[in-house]
Amino acid sequence: MGVKRFGDWDKAKALLANNPGARLTLAIRQATIKNALLLVREIKRGIVKQAPGGVPFVKLAESTIERKGSSKALIDTGFLLSAITQKIMADQAFVGLLRGTVNKDGEQMVNIGAIMEYGATIKHPSGVTIILPARPFLHPVMEAYREQVIENYRQAIRSVF
């Protein structure tokens, strides 16, 4: 049984002769940076607008609004907003809160972010239970921009070939 070739082999040889590996690597890296910056910008914008990815936050309790003097969630000190970042590693990117980032009280921002993203129930020894509802600020943005991120990678690949 022989092997049959199909497709435009002359075109394939021409494309591969130009060593697309280095150009493809660069294009993918540039798309990765573009996507990471897009997501960081939109996560921050979503927090400020109180609707990351178009999904409105659960409203604050009246007692919280009175104590804070504001009805806006996640922006009273600005530490969470300023801690949202990206880290590029070759053709990968991390977008969110880096471990080791702390606020002025020494609290890990990644822990605070997890509580905000997923919610929490805190039981005090006095018997009082505080329920913090989830106010997702990362996942809704990543879902909303999923197709744009994919398209950015497609364009990067097309630019090489």
Segments from the language model and where they lie:
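Short, Lys/Arg-rich flexible segments
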Residues: M1-F161
